[in-house]
Amino acid sequence: MSNQQKQLQLPSASIKKPKEKQKSQIVRIIQSKFKDYQYMFLLIKLSTYSKFDQDDDFNTFLSFLESEYKFSKQLSSKEIVLSLRYTKNTKITPYINHSKFETEKKIS
């Protein structure tokens, strides 16, 4: 019985749980601000895989995106995603329309 309890408390299991919890916090914050789920998905991806992932405060998130990807906080979620989609920043290429990025990079 004590062996089973030890297996449940493996370091890898305890490392994964806070990350999932943190992701769901980010999801909830973005859901409350961006009603359009199609665009929300990309924002979650960005917040999860970028250096921002330490902080789930929404205004910090907007400031981060504003500084990293050069768009206004006044933009709608759709406009934000469109501007992110066409930003030539390699940090986000693995997470969004990859073929479009490749084409853009070759042209420019």
Curated annotation (Swiss-Prot):
Region feature (Disordered):
1-22
Name the UniProt record assigns to this protein: Putative uncharacterized protein DDB_G0286769
Which portions of the chain have biased composition (kind: Polar residues)?
1-12
User: Which branch of life, at top level?
Assistant: Eukaryota
